[in-house]
Amino acid sequence: MAEPSGKRLKTNLPNCKTHRAFLGSRVKQNLPAVVEESLCGVSTLIMEVAYILDALVRIFEQDDIALPRVAAFFHEQSVNEQAKAEAMLDYLSDRGGQYCSKDIQRPGCEEVCAVIPALELMLGQWKEEMAVMVELSQLSKEHSDPHSASVVKSRFLGPLVPRVKLLGDLLTNARRVGCTSDRSGGFGEYLIDQLQEELTNVSSR
């Protein structure tokens, strides 16, 4: 029986406005249309997060800021986000779904020039991503797709939890050593870049 095509309820999930034109164009592996659309939208959201993190890399590589370990940390997280987006696209394809290629807007983080606002931006993005994954998992359950619910929870939501905790710890330590939001805590940023274990471990890989 075909899935009813009513309006979507209010949701925080990224809405792929162009996706409905493609629905029904491929053989689905019991993939509900609303879940397919949401997987498509969430994949784009993850790519946007990867681009934001990549923009932060370039900021901390600038000569007037030059925090190489901080830049390396953001680079590693950007690569992880890109891999996550590709994994979700692979899952979407395996289930017979289709991704609608979209133009991703330039990240609006040019004004970020210090460690604390960069970490706060990253933390906000990950918290939003976590909330979206929770809703996507629940949506999948509600539409009788327990497989998608399980995959989202285990492969995409679960790994975010320790990463959010890590960022919270980094922010606490950054404030403790004197980092500020306006680059006036330059020595604190130097200490974070040189001594923070999570950052030095990244730079040695």
Regions found by a protein language model. Name each.
Residues 1-205:
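Iron-associated oxidoreductase/ferritin-like identity signal
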